UniProtKB/Swiss-Prot annotation:
Any one GO molecular function term: ABC-type transporter activity
Recorded GO CC terms: Golgi membrane; intracellular membrane-bounded organelle; nucleoplasm; plasma membrane
Stretches that traverse the bilayer: 31-51, 222-242, 268-288, 297-317, 327-347, 355-375, 397-417, 854-874, 1007-1027, 1062-1082, 1094-1114, 1127-1147, 1150-1170, 1194-1214
InterPro entries, per database record: AAA+_ATPase, ABC2_TM, ABC_transporter-like_ATP-bd, ABCA, P-loop_NTPase, R2_ABCA1-4-like
Organismal lineage: Eukaryota, Metazoa, Chordata, Craniata, Vertebrata
Source organism: Homo sapiens
Membrane topology per record: Multi-pass membrane protein
Enzyme class: translocase
PROSITE patterns in the record: ABC_TRANSPORTER_2 (PS50893)
Official protein name in the record: ATP-binding cassette sub-family A member 6
Swiss-Prot/TrEMBL induction comment: Up-regulated during monocyte differentiation into macrophages. Down-regulated by cholesterol loading of macrophages.
The ABC transporter domain, residue ranges: 478-713, 1288-1513
Gene3D superfamilies: P-loop containing nucleotide triphosphate hydrolases
Annotated positions binding ATP 1: G514, H515, S516, G517, A518, G519, K520, S521
Gene: ABCA6
Alphabetized Pfam families for the sequence: ABC2_membrane_3, ABC_tran, R1_ABCA1
Amino acid sequence: MNMKQKSVYQQTKALLCKNFLKKWRMKRESLLEWGLSILLGLCIALFSSSMRNVQFPGMAPQNLGRVDKFNSSSLMVVYTPISNLTQQIMNKTALAPLLKGTSVIGAPNKTHMDEILLENLPYAMGIIFNETFSYKLIFFQGYNSPLWKEDFSAHCWDGYGEFSCTLTKYWNRGFVALQTAINTAIIEITTNHPVMEELMSVTAITMKTLPFITKNLLHNEMFILFFLLHFSPLVYFISLNVTKERKKSKNLMKMMGLQDSAFWLSWGLIYAGFIFIISIFVTIIITFTQIIVMTGFMVIFILFFLYGLSLVALVFLMSVLLKKAVLTNLVVFLLTLFWGCLGFTVFYEQLPSSLEWILNICSPFAFTTGMIQIIKLDYNLNGVIFPDPSGDSYTMIATFSMLLLDGLIYLLLALYFDKILPYGDERHYSPLFFLNSSSCFQHQRTNAKVIEKEIDAEHPSDDYFEPVAPEFQGKEAIRIRNVKKEYKGKSGKVEALKGLLFDIYEGQITAILGHSGAGKSSLLNILNGLSVPTEGSVTIYNKNLSEMQDLEEIRKITGVCPQFNVQFDILTVKENLSLFAKIKGIHLKEVEQEVQRILLELDMQNIQDNLAKHLSEGQKRKLTFGITILGDPQILLLDEPTTGLDPFSRDQVWSLLRERRADHVILFSTQSMDEADILADRKVIMSNGRLKCAGSSMFLKRRWGLGYHLSLHRNEICNPEQITSFITHHIPDAKLKTENKEKLVYTLPLERTNTFPDLFSDLDKCSDQGVTGYDISMSTLNEVFMKLEGQSTIEQDFEQVEMIRDSESLNEMELAHSSFSEMQTAVSDMGLWRMQVFAMARLRFLKLKRQTKVLLTLLLVFGIAIFPLIVENIMYAMLNEKIDWEFKNELYFLSPGQLPQEPRTSLLIINNTESNIEDFIKSLKHQNILLEVDDFENRNGTDGLSYNGAIIVSGKQKDYRFSVVCNTKRLHCFPILMNIISNGLLQMFNHTQHIRIESSPFPLSHIGLWTGLPDGSFFLFLVLCSISPYITMGSISDYKKNAKSQLWISGLYTSAYWCGQALVDVSFFILILLLMYLIFYIENMQYLLITSQIVFALVIVTPGYAASLVFFIYMISFIFRKRRKNSGLWSFYFFFASTIMFSITLINHFDLSILITTMVLVPSYTLLGFKTFLEVRDQEHYREFPEANFELSATDFLVCFIPYFQTLLFVFVLRCMELKCGKKRMRKDPVFRISPQSRDAKPNPEEPIDEDEDIQTERIRTATALTTSILDEKPVIIASCLHKEYAGQKKSCFSKRKKKIAARNISFCVQEGEILGLLGPNGAGKSSSIRMISGITKPTAGEVELKGCSSVLGHLGYCPQENVLWPMLTLREHLEVYAAVKGLRKADARLAIARLVSAFKLHEQLNVPVQKLTAGITRKLCFVLSLLGNSPVLLLDEPSTGIDPTGQQQMWQAIQAVVKNTERGVLLTTHNLAEAEALCDRVAIMVSGRLRCIGSIQHLKNKLGKDYILELKVKETSQVTLVHTEILKLFPQAAGQERYSSLLTYKLPVADVYPLSQTFHKLEAVKHNFNLEEYSLSQCTLEKVFLELSKEQEVGNFDEEIDTTMRWKLLPHSDEP
């Protein structure tokens, strides 16, 4: 066994190189990835430049003077409620000297008081009495009192040379003065002791203020939020890339030996590099703009770098848990926002250390706490430095450690869940796998009792299973024992495999056959280790696949080719091979040699430097096969390996597999019975999860009663009854299967070959009975399969595939077709246009309704838009709540016995009297305050920054005077200390009550608070007006999947497509705008005055704005239709452009001319500009007429129509662009109509050289048909001198583009009732030809006529090569949309759809979304859509690809029913030559863009295929040499094709075969003399003819500018619909 050593380092390096190349080559995505992060950094820099970040130099203690120095003459005091006690208190309060001249008003209730206060802003103050000793003061916050309890931005400032602090507002603007007056009144009324002098003489002193860095309000919070989300763009792309690759490629790479750690490391390392660079960038911005001043570069960089790494690991974890990129992004964003914002609690509160450590497990929380540590130290002019004598910096090491630990935890969890939570039903580990050294899988245990009962023998010898040849006994490589597989479906368990029991042998090629859903792929998934059997066991070379260790060993020698292509599109062919070679563990020194070997064997040297995304589907399939055979694995598991390959490439693959047959185990599944017949030594046929039969082709054909097909060519005098009697005379059990005007086809049993010599001898004498000739062919494996499936067989026309119709199915097909002829005339002109508009509107609505991703994105963007508005309201609510607080002592001061707790301290009492102040001390202790008493001689209290406040007591006993000293950081210190003194005096007068004072916010519904965010309403307008690209760029997807082309070919008017889309998009956008208006109104309704004229103006402008923006985006979508959709990027452009336009108008002071100009030039800004326009006009009107309501003038109403002029302009531009790309479709369009133009066929640049005589005849016939004026004589399809050139890629900037020619002067026509097959290898020009005929691309030269008309519209049914379907729509919805597009009336459409569904057995799939249908059903749907309507022309581009034989039979019958006895013509391209033989009246073979031959199949065989194929199977291997010698003796020119074991194959020239009677006589003698088991003789097939012609394309021999088309890239679509 060829074992290879897998190195994690080698795999990681290879994947890292792949990721780097991906980033380098996908420049737009990488630019977006980097650009958004850089742009966010620049926004931070811009935001920082608008903020003043100034170092406050410090301030000496300040004496603010006495309380009664306040001048209150401008104040108004309003109180409530009015009672005797409150009046008494307020009367006494008014006597205070500081309130002299102050107006004191009583209000009966709070509502009335609020009205008075609002009318007298900002100098009115309110008082609400709760009881005698409790009241609430209402001041204008921010002016008379601070906004917050704490302030980390700037508690002191330098106001033009005068230092001031926030807490002094209480003292200087009347709050403490009014508090003191009220407290004095309460104490005097309660105790009858005068305290006016004691309280009014209180002086205020601020402690000294140390230097610090001043910042604007919420400056720190906003920057932390910016930094927290700075890596969000990167997170988006990480989740997108990782989720996509994990879903698409990771499991396949694991089958090749990829280690999980290598996958995650490769992505982790490249994004670690990105994080490293972006962290440097953002750190430079932070230090350069001095957002943080004192902390060094390296500390900030490490914090950001570790935080970014932890986010990468978090994305890995969430992508494993959630599996979808959209959900991953949303969840990571919300977790980052939530955990990060939770960290703000550390800013304002001191959390318990244990809780803080636990929360640090969330990396955003750890990052936020780290930033807060830096900011707090920066605030006090300290930085994070090492070594740090104070020890404050060392907490940052803990933060670094936690971020590093978080990243490791997330990464380990990602690796763990990656093993136990796979996609779907794939193999996965047990949750406790790490406890078991063997790493057992979940579900690996099978039913032990079953295993014990298993027998060693594969199957007893019976009629269904051919006995294994003796030479293979003991070579059992794969042993499958009682394997069952169940899947969980919605309706319960579904059994995919039902007790399979058979062996696969080394040295044999084994094919697994079966209809779609038979269980082939399920079995292969079990064999390649992707899935685990529900029951039973599988061993490969005696290693059990259920054991992880065994599976790893098997994977080292196994190559797997799945149904889908596995290449990385962004890598070249050579790079793909090199990458997978390294993943497979091929030694680095041997990688290049191995890659070159594969390129040579698959003939891909000339495309080795082409990117995989530019390859044709066939070339991609060859690349996938090449990846599979890298390293020459001993076991090959191939799931439909040749799907999409042309016969020549398929023959190459077959040859490679035959060469590897010896000492290898090759198992493949296929839908092609011919492939199995030719390639496989042993066929295993499955049905509904069970094994039906197994054996060689000859065994299966003999067992199921199928033998030879004898075709007799007849003329007019031939009597079928006489000929049938003649045949049955020689072979009684012969059966007449097909009878038509040209021939009779009989089935002859295989065991009757001994009678063939006499039969053919007599046939040679039957020319007088009307038999002009005969030929014989073997039955195909396809017929065996159809018989096993219980269906009627389709035998090959002429000598291989004569259609044997199942009458019931055929009747259904003919009934379905007849429904079209029974219909009324289809709707046309404006009626059809309206029907199509509504059909497109319905289509758009259904897509929008089911695009969960788009709706979630819209919801997220809407949430982002409304976020500032919510934040504003929350902040206002918090502001109201925070200011409405009680001035409690415990806010700043500790209680006795309480442990020190930030920010509380003890209260310092300084005795400046010459006596004992024990009475005052005692009164303070009653207030539960921890006191510290000292003498004034020791300290004056102004330098003690370790205290929040101090009271200096002076005077003499019983007549104290007080000074209050406050730390400038404690904003509410003065009211609290004044209350402490007041309550102390109460206690000294033996009163036990305490005065309680609260502060309440001023009764404003909207507070003018700048938070650093845009105004919420403005931001809402800005974002929602930029949201439109998410809604309206669906046409790009339609273009890319060619759905738009298909709709146009089906008869859709171009204007109907856009108008139908707009009908839904505009309506949806209007709904969003109305919702925005509603939110805006609810937010501002208390102070927003809306007149009927403003409402009318909005009613006018809103639909116009929605329409203009929608058609503007349609125009953009059309221009960039070949690129990615990038809705988010366009939304950002709209947002940015609107912001710039608003800034321009703002700078120009909202000049109306500039405002209107910006509205016209930038469609996305029009609505926001109109809102601004209304506001400016309202202000102008108010200045002129203060009392009158604002009314719009006639000029103002003209501005409302700007969006409508824009809409008309964009519709016109869109029409012009459509006109440029395709004039034909516009000629009948009722809206975009243009005048009919004469056909302008360009002369062909090439003249035909050395053409076959049949091609020349067809060219003359086509030219004649083109010029004839008799419509009845015109063919259905005329393709005259078609030539197509594409511009190739430049090799360098200065070189010219070389032309690539897809079609070279081809001419042919299709008559009514005829099916013409267009054959050729990949790249021969078939699809280009059919695209020219369909009108998708414009010919470089030549012309096309369909049913006598050059326009395609309404004349064509087209089944393209790819599935042009909408994944989220159901099968029924597709049929209904296309029926409406083709103009079928509702009743006719229902009838036609019902009959087609019945004919193709699609009832169960009617309401299933396309994305959940099998590949075969989706292909059927494409074909059925082409049949809808009564189109006289059908173009079918490989219609049966991927469909099982049963489905193919239905399709073939449908095609024949469509053409039979009708005026329709069909042009068919196919790689399935049996399909061509079954259906086509004529075939044309294209090679390198030219027609090489054309004619009936038998004509081509007679002309080009001169050989017969002889197969002999001997019973004893010892006879092989003798038989070979005898055959060469009997047939001297026989060429040995293949010798394998007991099977011999030869090619015999016609000269050696004719007459057939003598040939069969010789073969019967050989069979008798050498005891042959069986033999077969058949004429050369169409495939042999095709392969011979295809060699011309392989050899090349063309002009220099043309590559051999086998090596062409997929040609670009230059002329789109």
